[in-house]
């Protein structure tokens, strides 16, 4: 699972997920999966989608994961009364804004990339779309 090796603070406030993403272009590969909605992706969801892409392209080509779960999410145990401090860190999430490129693929055909990213999108809790590399001439 993806998670930071070390952080300055163990726990983080919830915060708000507003605005649009900054990195909206396919930079490394030829094809990408772009988020349409905003939301949170857990480390397990990111890994499940990555494994789906790897299986779909039969381990040819190259995959880039453009997101990293760097926000800790805390939970209190079941049947514990309110108060007594913040809960323990249970999982790590990446905050996703609209327009963010989640995954990139290179070295495969467009139809294979479309199919692989379609299968990966089914594992994610948000709407996504297929993105091509912009070539400025």
Curated annotation (Swiss-Prot):
Part of the 50S ribosomal subunit. The keyword Zinc does not apply. Belongs to the universal ribosomal protein uL16 family. One of its GO terms (molecular function) is rRNA binding. This is Large ribosomal subunit protein uL16. InterPro entries: Ribosomal_uL16, Ribosomal_uL16_bact-type, Ribosomal_uL16_CS, Ribosomal_uL16_dom, Ribosomal_uL16_sf. One of its GO terms (biological process) is translation. Keywords: Ribonucleoprotein, Ribosomal protein, RNA-binding, rRNA-binding, tRNA-binding. Binds 23S rRNA and is also seen to make contacts with the A and possibly P site tRNAs. One of its GO terms (cellular component) is cytosolic large ribosomal subunit.
